[in-house]
Amino acid sequence: MTATSAAELLDYDDVVARFEPVMGMEVHVELSTATKMFCGCANAFGAEPNTQVCPVCLGLPGSLPVLNQQAVESAIRIGLALNCEIVPWCRFARKNYFYPDQPKNYQISQYDEPIAINGYLDVPLDDGSTWRVEIERAHMEEDTGKLTHLGSDTGRIAGATNSLADYNRAGVPLIEIVTRPIEGAGARAPEIARAYVTALRDLLRALGVSDVRMDQGSMRCDANLSLKPIGQAEFGTRTETKNVNSLKSVEVAVRYEMRRQAAVLTSGGQVHQETRHFHEDGYTSPGRSKETAEDYRYFPEPDLEPVAPDAEFVEHLRQSLPELPWLRRNRIQQEWGISDEVMRDLVNNGAIDLVAATVEQGASSEAARAWWGNFLVQKANESGVELDALPITPAQVAAVVKLVDDGKLSNKLARQVVEGVLAGEGEPAQVMADRGLEVVRDDSALQAAVDEALAANPGIVEKIRGGKVQAAGAIVGAVMKATKGQADAARVRELVLAACS
């Protein structure tokens, strides 16, 4: 850790004893539309640089924007799911700034007239309680291009020798969701920040409006934070930590900023209003001074008509909303007959949707929970990734469960198959065949291993023949070891008892 070193940070318990954190979360979500916000260019991740561009998204003279209707519908659906009021009339504005990621030198956004206002999201926390986060607004805008800075140790523009611009992302439809100040969280502020982004991600995924891949930038979080002495009404000076790119990092970034700002304030210093960059090592570093709305010189976008959603159309979209995550979880809990504690563990591990998808592929809920809630959670923790980022699908887990149910794999062998899938060795059946892991059920092969184990353990054989049937477990264990766990244990036991009778 650099920037403010760990030794210079105030102890977290001291922070929450002296200061009250105030948070504000801004989440940018790229919409999964076929084309961009204001032109017909493809909206697809991973294409060769600057191959999905046109005069509109490059800001060439004479080009005019045309609004993407699907993006408007997605914005309304998001607003409705967040319990927002969908306004009867809104319009776009130009946000003016000069930076290479925006070839027009302005971004088409919404300023004082967003499409959705005054909502809320009830966020489940680790202990089973909920925290209501109030939503100030959700507004439409276009994304910027992506810059790659070369020659800089940090990967940022400071110190770079060259900067490469890829405008494939310029003009991609975005929804920015802005909360009202989150007060009263105290020591739980980092947890609530992570839980909010998690709940929002799950909601957007359920709506089908975005793939919400934080690792690919289709969901990006900016965390605003200020501290004020406990009992003080006036807010402190806030910082904005930009583009935090994982759920865990949201929690780490908020906790770090609380400790850093507290250290500044207790030493008699002043917190500067600025943007800050989050580093994967767990610290933030200064960016630029935080701009105000006046700096961007907003004015109405003259090339786009206002948007006036018809009330009947809005109601149609409301009625078409899918089952929302919290309702789905309640239904699933009843169907599976699991306790609140088990459900809470599945939710906290990010496993609930993966388990449900595995059940839909034919696995039992018990088997699906065992895989996603135990073994695969461990693998995700070992890899330092979210559970849904593991390179294995619910369909593949269901296939492993079927191989076990069919008697082709034992639970121990199944874990080896899953490890092979995670290593990219192919589908479960292929991994089983390539690694030679299928359970041995052929009596002739098993009998040879049993005979060898019996010959090596005459004392145990005498115990079995003397009526101590439980001693057969030692012979079964020897056979399982000799066959590297591939023998059918139940059949081996039958053969052992038959040989000793």
Curated annotation (Swiss-Prot):
Top EC class for this record: ligase
Catalytic activity, EC: 6.3.5.-
Keyword set, alphabetical order: ATP-binding, Ligase, Nucleotide-binding, Protein biosynthesis
UniProt key word Protein biosynthesis: yes
InterPro entries: Asn/Gln-tRNA_amidoTrfase_suB/E, Asn/Gln-tRNA_Trfase_suB/E_cat, Asn/Gln_amidotransferase, Asn/Gln_tRNA_amidoTrase-B-like, GatB, GatB_Yqey_C_2, Gln-tRNA_amidoTrfase_suB_CS, Gln_synth/guanido_kin_cat_dom
SMART domains, sorted: GatB_Yqey (SM00845)
GO biological process terms, semicolon-separated: glutaminyl-tRNAGln biosynthesis via transamidation; translation
Record flagged with keyword Cytoplasm: no
Substrates-to-products reaction catalysed: L-glutamyl-tRNA(Gln) + L-glutamine + ATP + H2O = L-glutaminyl-tRNA(Gln) + L-glutamate + ADP + phosphate + H(+); L-aspartyl-tRNA(Asn) + L-glutamine + ATP + H2O = L-asparaginyl-tRNA(Asn) + L-glutamate + ADP + phosphate + 2 H(+)
Pfam families for this protein: GatB_N (PF02934), GatB_Yqey (PF02637)
A GO molecular function held by the record: ATP binding
Family statement drawn from the similarity comment of this UniProt entry: Belongs to the GatB/GatE family. GatB subfamily.
Role description: Allows the formation of correctly charged Asn-tRNA(Asn) or Gln-tRNA(Gln) through the transamidation of misacylated Asp-tRNA(Asn) or Glu-tRNA(Gln) in organisms which lack either or both of asparaginyl-tRNA or glutaminyl-tRNA synthetases. The reaction takes place in the presence of glutamine and ATP through an activated phospho-Asp-tRNA(Asn) or phospho-Glu-tRNA(Gln).
Subunit organization: Heterotrimer of A, B and C subunits.
Name of the featured protein: Aspartyl/glutamyl-tRNA(Asn/Gln) amidotransferase subunit B
Gene: gatB
